[in-house]
Amino acid sequence: MSFKTAEVSSLAERINWEKVDGLVPAIVQDFQSSQVLMMGYMNQEALVKTGETGQVTFFSRTKERLWTKGETSGNVLQLVNMSLDCDNDTLLVKVNPIGPTCHTGTTTCWDGDPQEESQMVWLHQLEQLLAARKSAGPDSSYTASLYARGTKRISQKVGEEGVEVALAATSGDKAELVCESADLIYHLLVLLQDQGLSMNDVINKLKERHK
């Protein structure tokens, strides 16, 4: 989502540039999972470019130039929104990350071991992969071909996998139950993506019911 020029101008005017010596700290947070991904610095030019392009851009203090996150790796940070803290000297930048954020290959710059990532973060990464498959050619993967066949076929697969889960449970085969449950959840995620929804919407509904 690109910010309107007026919104960027409003943020720029509110930032205490003198206090931050021309470089405002920008904390980057995953919009879906709320996980903090990294921190960088923006000067006024980087802030404006971030708003105009919809991709997070920082000012590199070592290279002394603007750099857009993912400009070489492709792991860009797609802007969702930006806001200032109460002191007007720190930005919170909410994003949809495309790929891992850290140059080490991990989801965040505070996560040294990919195996320690939370299950929900991994699930969100899977949803990102499915979103990419949705726009890919039908011959590129099974999932892409499923999207190409439309909602009716995807819904049919969810129904079929639901039956397989029930059969595995009644047979008492726990290993098979796990496998079939994985298939069901995968196809459910595909269906949610097809309908413009995510597992986050389902989780929010569950939270709402259990307040």
Curated annotation (Swiss-Prot):
Pfam families: PRA-CH, PRA-PH. Pathway: Amino-acid biosynthesis; L-histidine biosynthesis; L-histidine from 5-phospho-alpha-D-ribose 1-diphosphate: step 2/9; Amino-acid biosynthesis; L-histidine biosynthesis; L-histidine from 5-phospho-alpha-D-ribose 1-diphosphate: step 3/9. One of its GO terms (molecular function) is ATP binding. It is an enzyme of class 3 (hydrolase). Residues 123-211 are annotated as: Phosphoribosyl-ATP pyrophosphohydrolase. One of its GO terms (biological process) is L-histidine biosynthetic process. This is Histidine biosynthesis bifunctional protein HisIE. It is found in: Cytoplasm. GO terms for cellular component: cytoplasm. In the N-terminal section; belongs to the PRA-CH family. Its EC number is 3.5.4.19, 3.6.1.31. Residues 1-122 are annotated as: Phosphoribosyl-AMP cyclohydrolase.
